[in-house]
Regions:
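Catalytic glutamate of the conserved HExxH
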Residues: 106, 110-114
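Active-site rim/adjacent substrate-binding subdomains
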Residues: 1-102, 114, 118-124, 129
């Protein structure tokens, strides 16, 4: 399918397809959530999360959970799912996983963890999406 490494735009398109196909019990949390793709996580993000290996981070949900929002948050930045292109592509190469499925599972994982879903719940959501 790809004769060259997928671009940022390719990953954005896959993530948008993933959001459109995400299981309903997770989709209800996603009103107004954006998608951003960066090549690699920056040092500040890695430090904030306590992650030493930048290649280990494929995505991150940045935002405020719905239950923690207040009327005073009107001017806050919109929530965004950040996908890290190069770590995703490395995992894609190493595992042979379908790229859409890999991106979809990163999106599901980030959203679900942000909203407090357990690892078992996340595995169930990934199965539902298949």
């Amino acid at each position: 399918l790809y004769s060259v490494a997928p671009t940022t735009d390719d990953i954005v398109a896959l993530a948008e397809q993933a959001l459109a196909a995400i299981p309903a019990r997770l989709a209800e949390h996603l009103s107004g959530v954006g998608i951003a793709v960066e090549d690699m996580p920056d040092d500040a993000t890695l430090d904030e999360l306590g992650i030493e290996d930048a290649w280990a981070l494929t995505g991150l949900y940045r935002g405020t959970p719905i239950g923690a929002r207040s009327f005073g948050d009107i001017l806050r930045q919109p929530d965004v799912i950040v996908l890290y292109r190069e770590p995703i592509l490395l995992e894609w190469i190493e595992t042979g996983e379908d790229l859409f499925r890999l991106v979809r599972n990163v999106v599901i994982h980030e959203v679900a963890h942000h909203f407090g879903f357990s690892d078992d719940d996340i595995e169930g959501l990934e199965r539902e999406a298949d």
